[in-house]
Curated annotation (Swiss-Prot):
It comes from Buchnera aphidicola subsp. Baizongia pistaciae (strain Bp). Its main location: secreted. It comes from the Bacteria. It is found in: Secreted. This is Putative N-acetylmuramoyl-L-alanine amidase. GO terms for cellular component: extracellular region; outer membrane-bounded periplasmic space. Belongs to the N-acetylmuramoyl-L-alanine amidase 3 family.
Amino acid sequence: MIIAIDAGHGGQDPGAIGKNKFQEKNITLSIAKKLTKLLNHTNFFKAVMIRRGNYFLSVFKRTQIAEKYHANLLISIHANSSKNRKISGVSIWVLPKNVHNTRIQKHKLNKKTKNIHKKINTKTSKFKNFYEIEYDLAKIIIQELRKVSTLNQKKPKYAKFGILKFSQFPSILVETGFISNPIEEQHLNKKFYQNLISKSISIALKKYFLKRIKQYN
């Protein structure tokens, strides 16, 4: 199972900036590196990083890189921001089902997309569609993250983010906390907290795919 890890923003695009001037692009890269390392220490996943340093990549280029690595799944790492500095917590985003169904129909006759479906089915047996994979996995990631962090939302949220919309494989966006919240900004910049977030996502991924394999064997 090949998982593409996308560190949000980069280069001239710092992403959100906290009160203490910590930048989202640096936090996402650090968490992405830790998550990639954890996944590659398992015998179940091969993780590849889309952005490896401090440089800018368009959404289109990110999806291109993931496709180049023949990714079966994409996890995009971000940090949230709000004008209300009291808001905090983790949230997980997936593509709305109606948009998903339209996207699937558009790629239905695309041989490459069919091959991606085949790869997913080979590793995790039969899935109905991308939406099911994303939503069910997102719920398990939330279950794990709530053990180490506060939640902004108890269920996966819907959005038409470019990285979700233009990927030709299941994709999930993880907002690891609010960098606009001074306390959470400090947490997000600490290696200990980044390790907790990375480990939680790694555990969730393994739980989800093992569950699916057992379910359909």
